[in-house]
Amino acid sequence: MSDDIKKGLLGIIVDETEISKVMPEINSLTYRGYAAQDLCSRCNFEEVAYLILNKELPNKKQLKEFKKELSKEITLSKNLISILKKIPKNSHPMDVARTAVSVMGLEDKETKDNSPKANLRKAIRIFAKTPTALAAFYRLRKGKKIIAPKKKFSFSENFFHMCFGKVPNKEIVKAFDVSLILYAEHSFNVSTFTARTITSSLSDIHGAITGAIASLKGPLHGGANEEVMHMMKKIKKPENALKWITKALKNKDVVMGFGHRVYKSGDSRVPTMREYFKRVAIIKKDKIFEKIYDIVEKVMIEEKNIYPNVDYPTGPTYHLMGFDTDFFTPIFVISRITGWSAHIMEQHAANKLIRPLASYKGSKHRKVIQLNQR
């Protein structure tokens, strides 16, 4: 293979962005210039969503208006609810998320309008409605009635309310908020680049986000948090962890939740999420997965010099919160919609069709032989 070919676009800078900056050399991630860790400690998710979409943190008046807009758009159409009821209960929620956003695109009167203001309005609608759609399916597949959102609740509180019919204590809601903030944006990852590529053809925001959701579903991207939990469930208890991870490494199995294409000495989001994983484990009085976490992490670092990524602590945190494992990546979706939307709008603002080249390595020119002579 020629040195000119960069498989996976590794190391290739394809564009500029003002949205986020990943700095592996100093183990840092910023959104619009603000450190993600600082945003986690000082802001709620709605504030960070506003920042990503509008370039600045909101003041009290702006935040109140933003929440009002979300509240206005949070309900689903009767048509979408009807479709959700017809979806097979064994469908993966990521496929449901993709379908729901597609339907939103069919229903949105501004679908064809790619102006900045229209795209922002559509982004807010998708951001508000997607959690409602996912929570509705969460209950429908269990044979339960859909729970309507309540205006008095925050973004995170409403999601718990719509899924479980109750809101947990503030510490768990804060942990969920933190996970959403850490998942909200991460520069030109696979799903974001997918969204920008679709946008570069001047397609609409619903189509771009639908494509991004399909990309995020893969276990090498967003689906890793689900795979982490499947791994921990296989291990079952801390006493099995060392034997399990030793065997996995001997067999050269892929250990999900470890390694990153950008971070090589540790994901900057992990320490913050690890702390909230610990807090949730204490509240739930369940330290089994935390102990498994520590044993597997220690072996991976010592034996392979590979560090965990943010999916590693997030998976068991969502499990302790009560979410089904196949809902972990959809939670990622409801957060990352903010980042995708910002990138879609940024792509429109200075667009150029994304069209890379390929180095052909197939057969040389061949003469076509008639069918009866082959």
Language-model-detected regions and their locations in the chain:
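Non-transmembrane, aqueous-exposed alpha-helical and coiled segments at domain scale
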Residues: 1-374
